[in-house]
Amino acid sequence: MAPRGFSCLLLSTSEIDLPVKRRT
């Protein structure tokens, strides 16, 4: 139901947050 922009943003954040958490 969320807009495409939100879905894309969420996916991008998840992809960036994953490596960051792995590094820490």
Curated annotation (Swiss-Prot):
Listed CDD domains: humanin
Keywords per UniProt: Cytoplasm, Secreted
GO BP terms, alphabetized: negative regulation of execution phase of apoptosis
Induction summary: Down-regulated 6 hours following staurosporine (STS) treatment and up-regulated 24 hours following STS treatment. Down-regulated 6 hours following beta-carotene treatment.
Cellular compartments annotated: Secreted; Cytoplasm
Primary localisation category: secreted
Tissues in which the UniProt entry reports expression: Highly expressed in the kidney, heart muscle and testis.
Stated family: Belongs to the humanin family.
Functional summary from the UniProt entry: Plays a role as a neuroprotective and antiapoptotic factor.
Protein name: Humanin-like 1
Organism: Homo sapiens (Human)
Organism classification: Eukaryota, Metazoa, Chordata, Craniata, Vertebrata
